[in-house]
């Protein structure tokens, strides 16, 4: 029985990570659309801002997944 639960757990984790990846892309596209309408795309400031926003988004998602994994192991 433990083998089946671990397989289902890993499949659900992969599905959750796929959803999180799509959320990252959706938020990134929305923020970049806002930045492109406000800032010219060929400036150095736009490139730096785009990189910083992407880094912050990935950092926040990484922290969220870390705390979710930490809380999941504490419950067991």
Curated annotation (Swiss-Prot):
The chain crosses the membrane at residues 46-66. Residues 1-21 form the signal peptide. It is a single-pass membrane protein. It comes from the Viruses. Glycans are attached at residue 71. One of its GO terms (cellular component) is membrane. Induction: Expressed in the late phase of the viral replicative cycle. Keywords: Glycoprotein, Host cytoplasm, Late protein, Membrane, Signal, Transmembrane, Transmembrane helix, Viral envelope protein, Virion. Residues 23-45 are intravirion. The keyword Oxidoreductase does not apply. It is found in: Virion membrane; Host cytoplasm. The keyword Lipoprotein does not apply. Pfam families: Pox_A9. Coiled coil: none annotated. Residues 67-76 are virion surface. InterPro entries: Poxvirus_A9 (IPR006920). Envelope protein. Required for an early step in virion morphogenesis. Belongs to the chordopoxvirinae A9 family. This is Protein A9 homolog.
């Amino acid at each position: 029985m433990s083998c089946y639960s671990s397989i289902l757990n890993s499949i659900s984790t992969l599905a959750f990570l796929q959803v999180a990846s799509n959320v990252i892309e959706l938020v990134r596209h929305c923020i970049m659309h806002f930045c492109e309408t406000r800032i010219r795309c060929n400036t150095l400031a736009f490139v730096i801002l785009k990189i910083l926003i992407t880094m912050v988004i990935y950092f926040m998602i990484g922290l969220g997944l870390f705390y979710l994994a930490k809380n999941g192991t504490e419950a067991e």
